[in-house]
C-alpha cells in the first residue's frame, strides 16, 4: 500500500480556504505552528504526495476531514490503500511503549476476536466492553478490530484470520482516545465523531448532534471509546444526559448501524457507580471480556516472531518471567533482541529486563 497521500486537485481550494479561515497570513506561519517542515507544508498545499502521518497532522490542524481531501487512485478503495502502520521505515518487532501498530504484530485473543466480530456481523450491531488491567492490551485489541479486516493478506502472518466480516469495507471505525483532553468535552467529541462520518461543523449542541448522527448514519459504524475511565473520573460536561443520548442513538435512531466498543479497567456498570453516573448507557454492554495473560502457545508465537531467533532456553526464560502477559513479553523480547544486535549487552540483558519488570509491576 502507498505510504504517502496527497490532496485531490478539486479539494485544494478547500485547503487554502481553511488556511485563511485559521488566520495564517502565509505558508511559513502555518508551518511554524505544526510538526511537519515548511517544505512538507508546501508540498501538501500544492497537492504533492507527503507522508501519511504528516498528511493527517496537517488536516487535523485545519479541522479538515483527511478522508474527504485525499486523492484516491481510480478503482482502489480508500480503506485498502491507506497504510496500516505508523511512521517511516520498518515496524519495530517489539515495542512495549505503544499499542500494537500493525495487525501482523498482534498475537492471541482469538476467542475475543471470534465473539467481537460475531456481534458485529449482523444488524443490529451489538455493544462490547473490553476490560483489563493497565497494559493488558486493551487498546491494542481495540485497534486490531478496526484494522485486521481491511489489511491485505500479504501484510499478515500466514496464521492470521482476516475474513471476519462479510463486507469489511462497508464498516466505518471511529477511534476515540478519551485520555485526549480535546475529546473530553461535548464540543470536541461531537466534532470528532461528526468529522468521522463526513460532516464538518463549527458548533454543535446535543440536539443537533443527535439529529445529524441519526440522519447520516448510513453504514455500519463502530465507535471505539478507549479508556472511558479517564472522562468518567474527570469533571467535564460528558454527564448522564450525554451518555443517555448515546444509548438512545444506538438503540433507536441508527437503524441498527451503530455500536460502541469501550475499554475500561472495570465493568462499565461498576465504573459508573464508583464515579457517580447513573445513565443506562453503561448497561448496554452484553459482552464484556476480561483480558488476562496470553495462552502460552500464543506467547511463544510472539517470542518466536523475532527477526533474530532466540535460543530455546531464552524463550523459556522470557515465558516464565513474563507469565505470558503481552506487555511484559514485549519488554523482555526487546531486551533480548537488543542484546543480540549489540553483543556488549549479552551479559546484562536478563538483569536489565528484570529491573524494568520490577519498575512497571510496582507502578
Task: Report residues per predicted region.
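A short, Lys/Arg-rich alpha-helix, primarily the initiator
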Residues: 1-33
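Recognition helix of helix-turn-helix/homeodomain-like DNA-binding domains
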Residues: 32-50
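Short, basic-rich loop-to-helix N-cap that marks the start of a DNA-contacting helix
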Residues: 46-60
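Walker A/P-loop-proximal flanking segment of P-loop NTPase domains
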Residues: 81-148, 155-163
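Mid-core helix/loop region of P-loop NTP-binding domains shared across ATPases and GTPases
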Residues: 184-257
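Short regulatory helix/loop adjacent to the ATP-binding pocket of P-loop NTPases
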Residues: 267-285
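Conserved small helical "lid"/interfacial subdomain of P-loop NTPases
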Residues: 286-314
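Winged-helix-like regulatory helical subdomains adjacent to P-loop NTPase cores
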Residues: 300, 308-363
Amino acid at each position: 500500500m502507498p505510504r504517502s497521500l496527497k490532496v485531490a486537485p478539486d479539494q485544494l481550494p478547500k485547503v487554502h480556504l481553511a488556511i485563511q479561515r485559521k488566520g495564517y497570513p502565509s505558508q511559513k506561519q502555518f508551518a511554524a505552528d505544526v510538526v511537519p517542515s515548511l517544505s512538507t507544508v508546501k508540498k501538501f498545499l500544492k497537492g504533492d504526495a507527503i507522508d501519511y502521518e504528516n498528511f493527517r497532522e496537517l488536516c487535523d490542524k485545519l479541522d479538515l476531514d483527511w478522508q474527504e481531501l485525499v486523492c484516491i487512485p481510480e478503482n482502489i478503495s480508500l480503506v485498502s490503500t491507506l497504510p496500516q502502520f505508523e511512521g517511516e521505515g520498518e515496524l519495530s518487532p517489539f515495542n512495549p511503549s505503544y499499542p500494537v501498530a500493525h495487525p501482523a504484530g498482534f498475537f492471541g485473543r482469538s476467542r475475543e476476536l471470534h465473539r467481537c466480530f460475531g456481534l458485529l456481523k449482523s444488524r443490529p450491531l451489538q455493544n462490547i466492553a473490553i476490560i483489563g488491567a493497565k497494559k493488558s492490551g486493551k487498546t491494542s485489541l481495540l485497534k486490531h478490530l478496526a484494522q485486521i479486516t481491511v489489511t491485505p493478506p500479504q501484510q499478515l502472518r500466514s496464521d492470521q484470520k482476516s475474513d471476519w466480516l462479510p463486507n469489511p469495507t462497508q464498516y466505518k471505525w471511529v477511534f476515540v482516545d478519551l485520555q485526549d483532553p480535546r475529546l473530553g468535552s461535548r464540543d470536541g467529541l461531537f466534532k470528532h465523531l461528526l468529522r468521522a462520518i463526513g460532516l464538518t461543523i463549527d458548533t454543535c449542541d446535543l440536539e443537533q448532534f443527535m439529529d445529524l448522527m441519526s440522519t447520516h448514519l448510513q453504514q455500519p459504524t463502530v465507535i471505539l471509546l478507549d479508556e472511558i475511565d479517564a472522562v468518567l473520573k474527570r469533571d467535564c460536561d460528558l454527564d448522564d444526559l450525554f451518555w443517555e443520548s448515546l444509548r438512545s442513538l444506538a438503540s433507536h435512531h441508527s437503524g441498527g448501524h451503530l455500536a460502541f466498543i469501550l475499554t475500561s479497567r472495570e465493568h462499565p456498570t461498576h465504573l459508573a457507580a464508583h464515579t457517580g453516573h447513573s445513565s443506562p448507557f453503561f448497561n448496554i454492554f452484553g459482552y464484556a471480556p476480561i483480558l488476562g495473560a496470553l495462552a502460552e502457545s500464543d506467547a511463544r508465537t510472539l517470542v518466536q516472531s523475532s527477526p533474530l531467533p532466540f535460543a530455546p532456553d531464552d524463550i523459556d526464560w522470557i515465558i516464565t518471567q513474563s507469565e505470558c502477559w503481552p506487555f511484559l513479553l514485549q519488554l523482555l523480547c526487546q531486551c533480548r533482541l537488543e542484546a543480540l544486535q549489540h553483543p556488549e549487552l549479552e551479559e546484562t540483558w536478563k538483569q536489565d529486563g528484570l529491573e524494568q519488570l520490577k519498575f512497571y509491576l510496582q507502578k
